[in-house]
Regions:
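Glycine- and Gly-Pro-enriched alpha-helical subdomains that act as flexible
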Residues: 87, 91-108, 112
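C-terminal edge-of-domain segments
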Residues: 68-81, 85-88, 185-220
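Phosphate/pyrophosphate-binding loops at sites that engage ATP/ADP/AMP, CoA/4′-phosphopantetheine
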Residues: 112-126, 243
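Short glycine-rich phosphate-binding loop at a beta-alpha junction
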Residues: 125-132, 303
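Short glycine-rich anion-binding loops that position phosphate/pyrophosphate groups of nucleotides
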Residues: 9, 76-78, 100-101, 195, ...
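Beta-strand/loop-alpha-helix module characteristic of Rossmann-like adenine-cofactor folds
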Residues: 2-43, 225-230, 329-337, 343-371
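Accessory alpha-helical/coil subdomains and C-terminal extensions
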Residues: 19-89
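Class I S-adenosyl-L-methionine
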Residues: 142-143, 148-178, 185, 226-339, ...
Length: 371
């Protein structure tokens, strides 16, 4: 054999074989070099695809021929050991999940692994997990998503009920429980759209059901359903950059939306590039908390910025009080993470020395948010 410089393939054929589009996976990357070497030597390539739309391959300058001596295979099917084709797994599958409350992640994982194996499907081709919004806070589903390293998307019962004509196994029992005739099949079909198809019908375990649908092209998860929203409640400390926690920095960087008192947002201005920001003046704490909760309940990743520590005379308590008081389904389902910060009393104590080395009591001198 001889070495093949893959950048030569980029220059000659207008395609980066070893860097496919986002979401595509190569299960046998060791085949890349030999294929590129053959192309450089003048050989043609045969393309076998189970997916209709593969423009990044077809529109390239690859010497594609039905009689090519080299081969590229595009498939959602798992490959056998020793597969001779260079294989690509495109993101064209959606895993629909329905379950009873309290199902374990392990039960879901075992059901998915068993079903994928029986149907010879590659987990690398699954673009996301889809379900009904009633299950947005179901820990078992999120454990499955973490295990598969996949995003989740959720639909309302009305959206899933509109898929009833396309279900293979509609259920009146499911309808009486959640308001649609099928969750796993309905969610999978809703995600892939009308051009897609159900390729694995509802499959059951004791407390869960799954189904798998296939799209005709790459799945864009931003075009359907909503994600489970996340609300980060972050304390920025006394204001000095070097007294911020790394958790605060990461939370704001990962957020799409940031809410806070104008002065507090000014203190983290270096982290706000590309974020949608909402601010209000002092004494409007409840409106800020409500805004942050509503944004998160719409599927966004939100940071609510407080001074000091978010849980000490700050907005974390107010957020939990509002959610408890309103008892709104959309609000109850969001993921909340409180990130601690350095409180002003800790900063003042550090300037003095160590006055709080033993038991102590903190008393607020303000009648705002503490009465």
């Amino acid at each position: 054999g001889h070495p093949a410089i893959t950048t030569a393939g980029d220059l000659l054929f207008g395609i980066s074989i070893d860097e496919p589009p986002e979401g595509w996976k190569i299960p046998n990357p060791e085949k890349v070099k030999s294929l590129v070497a053959g192309l450089i030597d003048g050989e043609s390539v045969r393309v076998e695809s189970s997916v209709e739309n593969i423009p990044w391959i077809i529109s390239s300058d690859l010497p594609i021929s039905e009689k090519g001596s080299l081969s590229i295979k595009v498939t959602e099917k798992s490959i056998k050991k020793g597969e001779r084709h260079l294989t690509f797994h495109p993101p064209v599958l959606v895993l629909g999940v329905g379950c009873e409350r309290g199902v374990t992640g392990n039960e879901l994982i075992e059901l998915v692994e068993k079903t994928l194996g029986e149907n010879q499907l590659a987990r690398e081709s699954i673009a996301c997990i889809a379900s009904i919004d009633l299950k947005m806070d179901e820990s078992g589903i999120h454990q499955l998503a973490d295990y598969l390293n996949l995003p989740t998307r959720f639909f309302t019962n009305d959206e899933l009920e509109s898929q009833t004509p396309f279900l293979k196994n509609p259920s009146d029992i499911v309808f009486s429980a959640v308001g649609c005739h099928g969750v796993s099949e309905g969610a999978a079909i809703a995600a892939v759209g009308r051009g897609g198809s159900l390729i694995v019908e509802k499959t059951k375990s004791e407390k869960a059901t799954i189904a798998i649908a296939k799209s005709t092209s790459d799945i864009d998860i931003h075009k359907f359903g909503i994600a489970r929203g996340k609300l980060n409640i972050v304390g920025l400390g006394p204001g000095k950059v070097d007294w911020r926690t790394s958790a605060l920095t990461d939370a704001i960087k990962d957020s799409t939306h940031v809410v806070g008192y104008k002065l507090y947002l000014d203190l983290v201005e270096d982290l706000l590039k590309g974020k949608e920001c909402f601010f209000s003046e002092l004494s409007q704490e409840e409106s800020r908390a409500r805004k942050a909760i509503k944004l998160a309940s719409s599927g966004h990743n939100v940071s609510l910025v407080c001074s000091g520590d978010a849980g000490i005379y700050a907005l974390a308590t107010l957020v939990f009080e509002l959610i408890d008081r309103e008892n709104c389904d959309d609000w109850n389902r969001i993921q909340i993470e409180v990130h601690p910060g350095i409180s002003a009393f800790q900063a003042a104590a550090a300037r003095v020395g160590a006055p709080m080395g033993h038991d102590f009591c903190a008393i607020s001198l303000s009648n705002l948010l503490t009465s």
